Amino acid sequence: MTKNSNHDENEFISFEPNQNTKIRFEDADEDEVAEGSGVAGEETPQDESMFDAGESADTAEVTDDTTSADYYFDSYSHFGIHEEMLKDVVRTKTYQNVIYQNKFLIKDKIVLDVGAGTGILSLFCAKAGAAHVYAVECSQMADMAKEIVKANGFSDVITVLKGKIEEIELPTPKVDVIISEWMGYFLLFENMLDSVLYARDKWLVEGGVVLPDKASLHLTAIEDSEYKEDKIEFWNSVYGFDMSCIKKKAMMEPLVDTVDQNQIVTDSRLLKTMDISKMSSGDASFTAPFKLVAQRNDYIHALVAYFDVSFTMCHKLLGFSTGPKSRATHWKQTVLYLEDVLTICEGETITGTMSVSPNKKNPRDIDIKLSYSLNGQHCKISRTQHYKMR
């Protein structure tokens, strides 16, 4: 289902959600001014760029808490995932611009980098004049981060601590700034946000800064007959055999892929806004209403979720979007295929609710409940579907 974006890789279009706050979305070298979004359920104009039972407790599968944690951290020991993130210019350059263009947030401050990986954010902070940076990384990449810090001459400024943020002891009672790239697919996959909130509550001084401090989740609907036929309907006849029993399971697995903006059929709606500096851990579990209005006559095969992130403490508000009309990121978008093909006419609406919560067995996974209805001229339907991101 991977599609090619119509705009040049260096082209960025303004994003205009409904809010009075101006946000300048950053890419590699170009700046665009846009407006942020605020209220769940309100229309968010398409992101026109910058701103993805019954098992035993002793099972050997990743559903066991200890095993799942080990699996999660081990996955970040591989160089490939760090290469992908570092080469994500939207992601990495935005953080760099936030730090370098707003040194007043970092200079002479004690900084905590949660989930430091290779230490790139810590290096940015050290170069921007941080008094000291504590880079916490649980995976084996922590050993490489120490070498990277030493190779770049910042051993006296950056201390790499290997371990879980919930288990390590910082050599300082408080920090002035917490920085982290905690976002996963669908914003919340891998549940690293909880670690950031833990660090905030334990170490951040009153009035301290969290970077980024705002995130929002959005929803739209797309036509995607070709890919759904290839990936879902495929199970109806496999070399002449009926394997349709797999379809329901396949439908429950959200697809992370890049969506062509030409596939978009409806407007986009804000599902959830999170203030990382104030929210509690439980706020990441939510039920939000939505109303998607068709922009043309077409078929709908899936709903698509994406997220935006912003840094509101900067001189000029910075951030980025992972939506279909933005420059592609390694997060891509999250596609939720519908059991039925919806025939919709321009102006008709799909209404419903989406419930999101961590999986009870493995809190790094996400359970999604989607209820939707369409009362249109050619299609009348009301259905509830369940999805599991893992």
Curated annotation (Swiss-Prot):
Pfam families, per the entry: Methyltransf_25, PRMT_C
Highest taxon, organism lineage: Eukaryota
Disruption phenotype annotation: Reduced levels of proteins with asymmetrically dimethylated arginines. Altered leaf morphology and development (curled leaves), multiple rosettes with an increased number of leaves, delayed flowering, disturbed inflorescence morphology, increased sterility.
SUPFAM superfamilies named among the record's database cross-references: S-adenosyl-L-methionine-dependent methyltransferases
Annotated Basic and acidic residues bias: 1-10
Region named Disordered: 1-59
GO molecular function: protein-arginine N-methyltransferase activity; protein-arginine omega-N asymmetric methyltransferase activity
GO biological process, one term: chromatin organization
Stretch forming the signal peptide: none
Keywords: Chromatin regulator, Cytoplasm, Methyltransferase, Nucleus, S-adenosyl-L-methionine, Transcription, Transcription regulation, Transferase
Positions of the catalytic residues: 181, 190
Domain SAM-dependent MTase PRMT-type, residue spans: 69-390
Enzyme class at the top of the EC tree: transferase
InterPro entries in UniProt: Arg_MeTrfase, Methyltransf_25, PRMT_dom, SAM-dependent_MTases_sf
Subcellular localization: Nucleus; Cytoplasm
CDD domains on file: AdoMet_MTases
Documented EC number(s): 2.1.1.319
Catalysed transformations (reactions): L-arginyl-[protein] + 2 S-adenosyl-L-methionine = N(omega),N(omega)-dimethyl-L-arginyl-[protein] + 2 S-adenosyl-L-homocysteine + 2 H(+)
Keyword Methyltransferase carried by entry: yes
Record note on quaternary structure: Interacts with PRMT12, MBD7 and FIB2.
Function: Methylates (mono and asymmetric dimethylation) the guanidino nitrogens of arginyl residues present in a glycine and arginine-rich domain. Type I arginine methyltransferase active on both histones and non-histone proteins. Required for leaves and flowers development. Mediates the methylation of MBD7 and MED36A.
Family statement drawn from the similarity comment of this UniProt entry: Belongs to the class I-like SAM-binding methyltransferase superfamily. Protein arginine N-methyltransferase family.
Protein name as it appears in the record: Protein arginine N-methyltransferase 1.1
